Amino acid sequence: MTAFMVVSLVVVSQAQQTVVDKTVATVTDGVRTELITYSDLRWQLALQPNVQISPPSSEDLNRALRLLIDQRLFALEAERLPREAPTKAEITAKINEIVSYFPSSAEFERRLQAVGFKSVSDPSFEAIISERIAIDKYLAFRFRSFIVITAADEEQYYREVFIPEFRRRNKGVIIPSLQSRRTQIVEELTEQRVAQQIETFLDEAKRRAQVVILNPV
């Protein structure tokens, strides 16, 4: 590994501060290597509402690092499959979704500018969103599309989870029928199984891949 990969000597001015960017971690599957830089961590924090970014805390930086390691593992797997680049409409829709989590679009742009982007239309920012969309598509294909929820699954969840939880929260209220809550139950079961499969995938991917922390945050 070259010295450039360990510490990049790019100095950027952000919010009147001078920050030396550096490679925090590498993730490799033996064929390809993904880098995670300090800027990547700050960019991730900028996308999270109510998280301080100037200066960021060590706790938040490490939380962002764990998330980005997972994303890099997904990206390495996604690159094995043929895919079309996200469209401009998909990128715009994803940006609008992220903006909706903030008090205003102005507040979101202020956070982007604080970590070095010019606006939501900054090509570098759009490239990050494009990569996130590609990962989302991979997850939908790899996990969600193969999940089957049977009638027996629905009935068991309704009996063992939905009814006890409904009674706990709504004392004295008539319990809705399974039929009336079937869509909700299928969605909840699907999300549970997706989460379980993703957790299993990440555990296995981390055993196969090599994650090296070069500069602790």
Predicted regions located by residue number:
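Bacterial N-terminal signal peptides
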Residues: 1-10
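Periplasmic POTRA and POTRA-like interaction domains that precede
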Residues: 17, 21-49
